Amino acid sequence: AYTTEQCRALNGTCRFYACFPKNVVIGKCDWLG
């Protein structure tokens, strides 16, 4: 799973336990951010 920091490093946001960089789900996040 991606951490919130890893997701943000990819210019993504954590929603619904998934990382969404540019609106593409690439992996689960560790928590709802």
UniProtKB/Swiss-Prot annotation:
An individual GO BP term: defense response
Keywords, ordered alphabetically: Neurotoxin, Secreted, Toxin
InterPro entries, A to Z: Defensin_beta-like
Tissue expr: Expressed by the venom gland.
Disulfide cross-links: none
SUPFAM superfamilies the UniProt entry points to: Defensin-like
Record's protein name: Helofensin-1
